[in-house]
Amino acid sequence: MISRSALSRGSQLALRRPAAAKTAQRGFAAAAASPAASYEPTTIAGVKVASRDDSGPTTRLAVVAKAGTRYEPLPGLTVGLEEFAFKNTNKRTALRITRESELLGGQLQAYHTREAVVLQASFLREDLPYFTELLAEVISETKYTTHEFHELVENCIHEKQAKLDSAAIALDAAHNVAFHSGLGSPLYPTVDTPTSSYLNENSVAAFANLAYNKANIAVVADGASQAGLEKWVEPFFKGVPATSSGNLNTAASKYFGGEQRVAKNGKNAIVIAFPGASLGVPHPETSVLVGLLGGVSNIKWSPGFSLLAKATAANPGAEAFAHNYAYSDAGLLAIQITGKGAAVGKVAVEAVKGLKAIAAGGVSKEDLTKAIAKAKFNLLSASEVSGTGLVHAGANLLAGGKPIQVAETLKALEGVTAEKLQAAAKKLLEGKASVSAVGDLHVLPYAEDLGLKV
């Protein structure tokens, strides 16, 4: 291992940074002059890799594994795999991993989506060797011990189950009626799911063997050169198995549509969803439609131009926003509304009215221009702010595609016209919607009340 030398570099934090500051200044100038660079894909020692380098002082490195809830053979295995990340390995204890990362100023996190488990490290760019080694070690040499499962992993899962609110339950329900199994599986198992029948350290270890192999992972770096990755990925990931003896369930997604209603105390939530844009398939109209539907205003003291922002301003007590959930072979364009029951119902009615107005050609030139600009901002800021770009780049590689090409996508957004947007909205309304309501069902409307087909 090279951790000792990496740590000796990490202990000199106070003496390092004049060169890095100059590098950062050059990076900021470059960012102002041109759009964010796209991730460049390659294969290193059998591992799919994507990287982009803005010459900044920090790096984000992630292992994206095709092990999200869509692929778990039993409920709870994905979150179990996530919670075992950065625990004891054959070479290091969890305490040592934590202390070494802190000495280097690094940040470690593990999370999952419906399609992926993501192990991510953020650090100073000269510490790439240490964190590349660490991520390879975590996926190939983690100990799935009984005491850690019962004392740490199981408790974390129960805490996350207890935190599930109406908005999360409604979004899961919308996915369930839209896709049934696969993408329809909940992001976290509910409190009523009998996970004890399926979830233990042995089942998580078996799932790890299916998930963590070269055919099923992608390594994605933001802020690292491809040459640097080639230098360190090859020696450190050589111990990762090439394939697995078993197979994940990779059946193609199919959209169904439908309605689900769940009675629950507390805040109310409605999700109105339609087939959306998938990863790697250009559909700029969906991105512009999301910008036009909008949600929370970006301008203080103004409701903003978006349809949902205006609807919530007229109905205090509710919040709403639109988002396209993009997956490898499907997408879900969702309007999510939460708040007091009566206000949520009224905003839902206004949201559908707004969508029908778009389908009827009622979009002004000014609003279209604003929506396109908002779609551009969402695209360029996603990877910088939330790390979405890392996950999407990895997911595209695992699906056999290539990471999104920023320049091409920006050009496609500029080509969206009012007629194209009208046609896209009309197609959504002509098909089956996926509608979920959680909360006071006496107040929350049915899909039929909203004028939607399910």
UniProtKB/Swiss-Prot annotation:
Membrane topology of the entry: Peripheral membrane protein
Gene inactivation effect: Mutants display reduced growth, are female sterile and lack active complex III.
GO molecular function: metal ion binding
Primary site of residence: mitochondrion
Protein's cellular compartments: Mitochondrion inner membrane
A single cellular component GO annotation: mitochondrial inner membrane
Keywords: Electron transport, Membrane, Mitochondrion, Mitochondrion inner membrane, Respiratory chain, Transit peptide, Transport
Family annotation (InterPro entries): Metalloenz_LuxS/M16, MPP/UQCRC_Complex, Pept_M16_N, Peptidase_M16_C
Transit peptide: 1-35
UniProt subunit comment: Component of the ubiquinol-cytochrome c oxidoreductase (cytochrome b-c1 complex, complex III, CIII), a multisubunit enzyme composed of 10 subunits. The complex is composed of 3 respiratory subunits cytochrome b (cob), cytochrome c1 (cyt-1) and Rieske protein (fes-1), 2 core protein subunits pep and ucr-1, and 5 low-molecular weight protein subunits qcr6, qcr7, qcr8, qcr9 and probably NCU16844/qcr10.
Function as written in the Swiss-Prot or TrEMBL entry: Component of the ubiquinol-cytochrome c oxidoreductase, a multisubunit transmembrane complex that is part of the mitochondrial electron transport chain which drives oxidative phosphorylation.
Family as reported in the entry's similarity comment: Belongs to the peptidase M16 family. UQCRC2/QCR2 subfamily.
The protein's name in its UniProt record: Cytochrome b-c1 complex subunit 2, mitochondrial
Biological classification of the source: Eukaryota, Fungi, Dikarya, Ascomycota, Pezizomycotina
Gene assigned in the entry: ucr-1
